[in-house]
Amino acid sequence: MSESKVYPVKAHISNGALLDKAGYEAMYRASVQDPDAFWGEQGKIIDWMKPYTKVKNTSYDPGHVSIKWYEDGLLNVSANCLDRHLAQRGDKVAIIWEGDNPAEDRKLTYRELHAEVCKFSNVLKAQGVHRGDVVCLYMPMVPEAAIAMLACTRIGAVHSIVFGGFSPEALAGRIIDSGSSIVITADEGLRGGRPVPLKKNVDEALTNPDTRVSKVIVLKRTGGNVAWHNHRDIWWHEATAAASSDCPPEAMNAEDPLFVLYTSGSTGKPKGVLHTTGGYLVYATLTFKYVFDYHEEDIYWCTADVGWVTGHSYLVYGPLANGATTIMFEGVPNYPATNRMSQVVDKHQVTILYTAPTAIRALMAKGRDAVEGTSRQSLRIMGSVGEPINPEAWEWYYRTIGEERCPIVDTWWQTETGGILISPLPGVTDLKPGSATRPFFGVQPALVDNMGEPLEGATEGNLVITDSWPGQMRTVFGDHERFEQTYFSTFPGRYFTGDGARRDEDGYYWITGRVDDVLNVSGHRMGTAEIESALVAHPKIAEAAVVGVPHEIKGQGIYAYVTLIAGEEPSRELHKEVKEWVRKEIGAIATPDVIHWAEGLPKTRSGKIMRRILRKIATGETDSLGDISTLADPGVVDKLIREKSEAA
């Protein structure tokens, strides 16, 4: 096999695994040769109120992109995650909640979770939420976040979750775009020992005159002081106290919207990724089962926040549809002690751990302290998600956290894909550190050059997917034209991922990162355009350009070139002020790591900023700038290089 390091499947894994190499090959072959037959059979992994007779009805044709799966079937997501388990697994723990403070934890059985979801479903109905309405969630990592999600699905409402780290401005934009008239939040969140002012942020977001929110349901998490609007605000505990724990699930069409989740694009404002009910749930359920080699007795921990797609698919829906025990962690991996993540593994006897390279690199920087005094013997499978994992971090994770016992499933997928597209499978795949390896069933990746010509064999190029799969997003909320433009216009007839990849001689895929103007910071996607817009909204800034630079913990750091308006001078105070400004406009996650005060930016004669050059300057690769003859003023480049060395 190519690439220096290969870790073959270990006997103790293959002996108990759901699939072996031959099983994978046969299933994969069937999935691409006859998708209708394959997905028709796999669709039965969930329960249907009215079985489907149609399976796949999809088109990637220019101007006619349309994606439908199981389109005449009826089902309910919450019934699949709860009701169907009550007879056999009613007393099994569904959610283990581990608080920010290690002294706080809770367990909810499937029966208890079912009752809470029914109560909250009735609360939503009483507040006038109807089938098809969009409900905005801005919640901490507590079981009530999952309860609210499942309650929406029970009554046929569409949830739009906004990560609790986003600013009031970012929250308002998402509330307006989705048309939410109700927000579910908490007084405060807790993270790393510090309160997060969720209710205060909601109050501020709702001062935007374009919001149309009539009700805010508030969970009491910390008991911190919050402002109160009597006609608008409702306490969660008061509303649920009198609610009935009986609420029959709505029969939803497979193509009814399930949720909207906003993600950054390379241009303009974030786009609402729309996922529908049937195909999404089939895909989340099936990928969870096979990628994590799920067995009934497993204790599964995905460290992602519910505000990200990983939290949707692999903390809530995938695990619960499989009847698994899923851990929900409010805190951060290194608080109050460096070995917190390992402590949680031991405390709850976690068998499957799914986390992000950023967390792994942060722990790796602490060395053995990250595992001090813990055994982690319960671990069986470990996963990585959010961005490509560098081989050094992979090796450390494998050796130090998993003690060379646990295969690592390095999963590649996106908000848009609904679930994992490329990943090793335990029991099947020999591992190579840093490679996402092979495609999941029904997923047909290809590499193309910049002209869209297919590249064969071992090569590198733009990663496209040539046919649809059930978990694929259906459209951009309210803007199908943007959906086609973003994903299907670059390489017509194919879904363009926006990522580059390398394929080795064993057919393994190595994701090389974004090829568009999107950054991946700590596993979170951010469009450079979004950060640039926030910067130029500052009254003293005339122009800004943002590029990604390597960062040893976050994967990518944010490097901002900033040109001030005439008459303004750079200063330490302004530097601090600009960082604060971005934090307020978008959230702490978008704060620039470097601000480079630039007199001018390299532009073509048509006025386009040459980001390629800015990237090279930011990373110090100034001896390989390439052709700069098309620049309107080539002298700008020397000036930028000088400024950088002076700033350093």
Swiss-Prot record:
Family membership noted in the UniProt record: Belongs to the ATP-dependent AMP-binding enzyme family.
Protein name according to UniProt: Acetyl-coenzyme A synthetase
Residues reported to bind ATP: G386, E387, P388, D410, T411, W412, W413, Q414, T415, D499, R514, R525
Organism: Aeromonas salmonicida (strain A449)
Residues with the N6-acetyllysine modification: K608
Keyword Protein biosynthesis: no
Cofactor(s) the record lists: Mg(2+)
E.C. numbers: 6.2.1.1
